[in-house]
Amino acid sequence: MMSERIIRFLNGVGQDLEVATSSRGSSRHRAVVSMIGFFCEGRLSLQVIATLLVALLHIPRCFAQNLPATADKPWYSTQQNQFARRIEKYPEPTYTFEPGKTYTLAELVDLAERQNPDTRVAWQNAKAHAEALGVAKASLFPTIAAVALASTWRYGTLIDGGWQRQTVGLFQPTLNLDYLIFDFGGRSGAIAAAKADLFEANFAFNDMHRKVIYQVTAAYYRLLNAVGQEQAAKATLATARTVERDAEARLDHGLATTPDVLEAQAATAQADYDLQSAIGAKQIANGDLATSMGLRPGTNLLVESISDITIPEALSGTADDAVDRGLEQRPDLLEEVAKVRAADAAIEEERANYFPKLSFSGLGGLQRAYGQQDLFPGKYAGSETWNVQLNLQWTLFDGARREHAIAEAKARRTGAEAGINALRDRIADDVWAAYSNAETSLRQKQAAAALLASADRSYTAALRAYDLGVRNLLDVVAAERALAQARSADVSARTQVLAQFSNLAFRTGDLLRSAQPKGGP
């Protein structure tokens, strides 16, 4: 009865799978249907059918994780909620931050170096390479292991023409020692490669600090520019409102026309529009600075005013000096040099495989055993055990594996050398362009200062002439717009000098000079 129920159940499963097969077109489902039909028609034993049923119960697990059904629809699975819940296991770290405090650039850089997750990732990577160096050095020492063997077995043995049962038990604790005595530089090559990898990781760590410092510095100056633009827009709005009130007063006294007032009102509305744009740009710049420090974008940061910061007046040194500094101290270039050293060490490590290896192994311990046969009483026995051997291994043929391994290592070394040359060219070009941009920003700052002074005098003269009735309001509005543009250009020019000097320090690697040395693990 039970087998009949199972068969009926399997028939139902087969019908369901046939429906699924017709809708999904899976060859694997069709194979399962055929197998079920074969078993059900043959009326196999209950044990076989039950085994098949257990196997069928695991089929949903096989199809639980699948690919997207089509290319035009996103993939979705209930299992992705498990990944989403795992995010909660990694809470955001808490940082030291004082709301309401006006931060200098140096203070923000210090906070970013301690709080930016990218620096922690680079640090952990350097620590991992330091541990890898320790693993490589450990190969110079012997390996000692404690081993305890306990076993028992029973078998038949032939005694006096008959088979007798024999039982044996064994307990054997030992100390095993293995030591590679000499390998013609194989281990030293691995250690040299690990040291070069550690240098590479440390230089990458320093380069990450260089990038973080520049990200914070660039975002800081963008925020300074946004704050300055907001202040300039407020000043322009105040000027426009003054002109609007003057036009309305002159209209009341019959000295102005309605179009003059409308023109002044339009200028005020335009100034207010520009102010709102400046406020939005400041919010975005504030979010960029907070993000570069590892904080939430909504964190409100108070920074110094552009008027409180000393603007450089000239560049120190020539462009060639800047290029030379970049080629000497850029950590990413030093990282490429470390790759060449690692490739050299890998070549030496592979060459050692052409020579024999001499190793020593030995063990010593005690042995306690018990034995019994059906014809004789059981007995215990014990004694010390030891084994010592020298092993000389020399690979004579391996299908040219060593030749290919050395060729691969040499190719990697050649590629690393080419990487140095390519990066050297990019550094020289980047430094040269950054130096030229810095020089241009200095000249633009002087021109913007002269433009602001001229626009301010022009606006003052136009307003005075308008009050005297010798100029119309359109001339005043035009002078007002020119003054607003000059204010914006002056702020942009001053912050551009700071930004371009920072970019030059980033390209040459000078940003790391004033920072505390970051010597990785």
Task: Cite the ranges covered by each PLM segment.
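A glycine-/polar-enriched beta->alpha junction
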Residues: 110-120, 127-143, 174-192, 203-210, ...
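Transmembrane beta-barrel architecture of outer-membrane proteins
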Residues: 128, 170-172, 218, 263-266, ...
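N-terminal secretory signal peptides that target proteins for export/translocation
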Residues: 1-42
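Amphipathic alpha-helical coiled-coil scaffold segments and their short linker/junction regions
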Residues: 109-113, 256, 260-264, 295-363, ...
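A short glycine-centered flexible hinge/capping loop motif at secondary-structure junctions
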Residues: 251-255, 466-470, 507, 511
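Small/polar, glycine/serine/threonine/aspartate-rich low-complexity segments that form flexible
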Residues: 85, 89-101, 147-179, 304-316, ...
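Periplasmic alpha-helical coiled-coil/stalk elements that build and connect Gram-negative outer-membrane
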Residues: 203-325, 434-437, 441-444, 482-484, ...
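Terminal intrinsically disordered/low-complexity segments used for targeting and assembly
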Residues: 3-12, 46-111, 279-325, 505-521
